[in-house]
Amino acid sequence: MPKFELTADYSPTGDQPEAIAQLTEGVLQGVPAQTLLGVTGSGKTFTIANVIQNINKPTLILSHNKTLAAQLYGEFKSFFPHNAVEYYVSYYDYYQPEAYIPSTDTYIEKDLAINDEIDKLRLAATSALLSGRKDVVVVSSVSCIYGMGNPAAFYDNVIELKRGKLLDRNVFLRRLVDSLYTRNDLNLERGCFRVKGDTVDIYLAYSDNLLRVTFWDDEIDAIEEVDPVSCLRLGSFDEYRIYPANLFMTTKESTAKAIHQIEDDLHKQVSYFEEIGKPYEAKRLYERVTYDMEMIRELGHCSGIENYSRYFYGREAGTRPYCLLDFFPEDFLIVIDESHVSVPQINAMYGGDRARKKNLVEYGFRLPAAMDNRPLKFEEFQQLARQVIYVSATPADYELQQSEGIVVEQVIRPTGLLDPIIEVRPSLNQVDDLMEEIQQRIEKDERILVTTLTKRMAEELTDYFMKHDIRTNYIHSDVDTLERVQIMDDLRAGRFDVLVGVNLLREGLDLPEVSLVAILDADKEGFLRSHRSLTQTVGRAARNVHGKAIMYADRITDSMQKTIDETNRRREKQLKYNEEHGITPQQIKKGRKMTDLISANAEAHAETRAYIEPEERMAVADPIMEYMTRDQLEKSIERSRKLMQEAAKKLDFIEAAQYRDEMLRMEEMLKEK
């Protein structure tokens, strides 16, 4: 059984050895909850990686957003290159959930776009967990508490191959279809297979390569890994497991049984609506569910099939759904990163989902069973989380209570860097004062973060700085995950010097080039100016040797005073350690590529964000398009889709948008044919 093998160019220093020893001992002794209170830049991720190596248990790293999950995924990939480090986040590039607003009688239909690459990574994560390996780390967002397929059904459809084993080729093909692989001899894509005589090529749903199985009569003659483009052999196997192409596995028998139960519940709910005087809702529900059942009978699926998931998996009403945590063995560890944010987020997921579904059920859009397609309740998550390490620079009361006083502090940074100096300055003329500070930093090729209280103020401040020739960008809630990563990379690369934001400059952002953090209206008590928020924001300057934070305020609030006192306490401890060990603070130097998953050569991107003509001529501009047959149009649409996906992978969103628009226009033309 493979063990975790940590690879790093450095060894634990400062507080790290003690923190690693305490956390390891706690996990091995079965302590249910511990807290790692680590300051920004103290190497919390490296500490956790050492703990994982010591305990050798499958581990779930839970982060509160995709950007930080991607950052952690890249770091753990580099620490454990020889082990299974997987990534599990929502696979939607865009998701508009189904909803009904009674006040305006507005029904909003579900709309989504699935990211094929992330779908592959999700399948790779579940496949690694069910392989029986112990050396598995899964980095996840809160998607891990959302409903998914039954792990037992997924495992039952695993196909085990062995060279020399007797297996009829046609039986093998039927098993592939049962595992939701599709035969396509012309265009082999992920999740498909093709047959050429005695050779079967399978494009595994969780891999970038093909698996080639060669038969000699009814015997497996060879099992090989093949490059999908060059068809060169990459390796051979004596044994191999093929995991299903989809996380949501069902059988014909379970589908037939589910349809019968759904129709029974439909008649009960329709009768209920008629009894309470809601004939319109009864009619709507009957028509919608009847149509869905016809679609499932004919095609095997329907829009919104997840709302019937309870029937397919034989769950009782009100029981919790299966989720990623069910794929882990019983003896596993959960590490909750930035726990002061992640824990409340886990707690809030169920309530938000239930409020939306309640209207859909009450007004006849969905059966009551739709309520069981949901994220875990917080109590259900607690029951599954048998051993947890909470990681935060500012742990909340919940984590401290759960840990029952077991708090491991990590204050010393391996680089010798100190917590930033905090200055409080009056808010009068704060913008002019800040501009002087910014100019000083720009001369030293350093970066600046500015946090405001409102989105409007962030926009106006950005415009003001730009008018004064200060290269500025601002980040807000409308910026999607990939673009946010690109903005961070651009800041680090020096394409602009100042980043302005509201509540998006706090937890986990790894920006060593930032030497100044300016907090405007620091004395306005509230969520954005609480003790924890201020401490996290100040911490963004802690990775730079010249780190400094300026709070613009007319009075010192309790939250400000707590932040200043705690920062000074840590700074004093760090100074003392540096003096005792003869350490001179060193600037952190990190590669500018944020993750293995979301990476691009930033130099390849144009400075402008304008919508430009692509190098290739847009297909819909060609007059010959109007005379194409349906088949020709479909091929052109598929080509545009692939080009769009390739551009998105390179983070070239402008070109991707062009191909998307081209594809949508051609789809409109196809409808008219």
Residue locations for each model-derived region?
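ASCE RecA-like P-loop NTPase motor cores
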Residues: 1-590, 597
